[in-house]
Amino acid sequence: MFLLHEYDIFWAFLIISSVIPILAFLISGVLAPINEGPEKLSSYESGIEPMGDAWLQFRIRYYMFALVFVVFDVETVFLYPWAMSFDVLGVSVFVEALIFVLILIVGLVYAWRKGALEWS
């Protein structure tokens, strides 16, 4: 039989973690002063007058560089538990991790050839 009382802690955590941000937004909305003016609408740059436009558009190559970084950062997250339990796991898990790394190396070579890693 499926017992719902086993998940009471989960539901309590879910409710509390949902109520706290909602309360924070409600309290700040009620207590915050509403003073609209030119000072509020201007952008802030370390206490000095802003030079140029506040909204700059980044080139797409920065996004591609960041995307390649995120892919290999996630690779590290996936390989860390495997490295910590390497002595307990068998050879088959080593082969699986090797295949995983080889697939990522193929992706790196592909990104390199497409010019995603070119900075200039």
UniProtKB/Swiss-Prot annotation:
Its main location: plastid. Its EC number is 7.1.1.-. It is found in: Plastid, Chloroplast thylakoid membrane. NDH is composed of at least 16 different subunits, 5 of which are encoded in the nucleus. GO terms for cellular component: chloroplast thylakoid membrane; NADH dehydrogenase complex. Keywords: Chloroplast, Membrane, NAD, NADP, Plastid, Plastoquinone, Quinone, Thylakoid, Translocase, Transmembrane, Transmembrane helix, Transport. This is NAD(P)H-quinone oxidoreductase subunit 3, chloroplastic. Pfam families: Oxidored_q4. PANTHER family: NADH-UBIQUINONE OXIDOREDUCTASE CHAIN 3. NDH shuttles electrons from NAD(P)H:plastoquinone, via FMN and iron-sulfur (Fe-S) centers, to quinones in the photosynthetic chain and possibly in a chloroplast respiratory chain. The immediate electron acceptor for the enzyme in this species is believed to be plastoquinone. Couples the redox reaction to proton translocation, and thus conserves the redox energy in a proton gradient. The gene is ndhC. The lineage of its organism: Eukaryota, Viridiplantae, Streptophyta, Embryophyta, Tracheophyta. The chain crosses the membrane at residues 9-29, 64-84, 88-108. It is a multi-pass membrane protein. One of its GO terms (molecular function) is quinone binding. It catalyses: a plastoquinone + NADH + (n+1) H(+)(in) = a plastoquinol + NAD(+) + n H(+)(out); a plastoquinone + NADPH + (n+1) H(+)(in) = a plastoquinol + NADP(+) + n H(+)(out). One of its GO terms (biological process) is photosynthesis, light reaction. Belongs to the complex I subunit 3 family. It is an enzyme of class 7 (translocase).
